[in-house]
Amino acid sequence: MQCPTCQNTDSRVLESRSADSGKSVRRRRECLNCSFRFTTYERVESMPVSVLKKDGSRELFDKQKLFTGISRACEKTNFSSEAIINFVDGIESQIVQDTNKDIKSSQIGELILKNLRKENEVAYIRYASVYRKFNGVKDFISTLESLKGSSKNQLASIS
């Protein structure tokens, strides 16, 4: 690792520890030339995932787009910023684990809906209204009724 002050490539590791919930390793280093101490992070390089759009085009998976869409759906709900980040990380992990290189945008949308439904019904309705392009009140009512029906089924299975 190159020293940020003298650009020497020889350094020794003083300390290593897991960081970012085990997704990276934080290393404290010391330059053998100038004794400057600095921190580096080591992460696994993931294979890029391509998203196949409805119009047939292809683009690289963008975690920020996912975060933005879910954040909008979760505005003014009890979802904290940290919970949204964890939710997005979970969706990203599922996408990376379940796909080789390509995933349809519709699969991502359905995966988000499936997970949002379990976490927060308001965020689910908001996301569904945009993703499924609700045209009117009837679309909201039918989605609310399906939520209401699944809630009754869950209560019946608990009893």
Swiss-Prot record:
InterPro entries: ATP-cone_dom, NrdR-like_N, RNR_NrdR-like. Binds 1 zinc ion. Residues 1-21 are annotated as: Disordered. Its cofactor is Zn(2+). Residues 49-139 form the ATP-cone domain. GO terms for biological process: negative regulation of DNA-templated transcription. Residues 1-11 have a biased composition (Polar residues). A zinc finger (unnamed) spans 3-34. It comes from the Bacteria. GO terms for molecular function: ATP binding; DNA binding; zinc ion binding. Keywords: ATP-binding, DNA-binding, Metal-binding, Nucleotide-binding, Repressor, Transcription, Transcription regulation, Zinc, Zinc-finger. Belongs to the NrdR family. Negatively regulates transcription of bacterial ribonucleotide reductase nrd genes and operons by binding to NrdR-boxes. This is Transcriptional repressor NrdR. It comes from Prochlorococcus marinus (strain MIT 9301). The gene is nrdR.
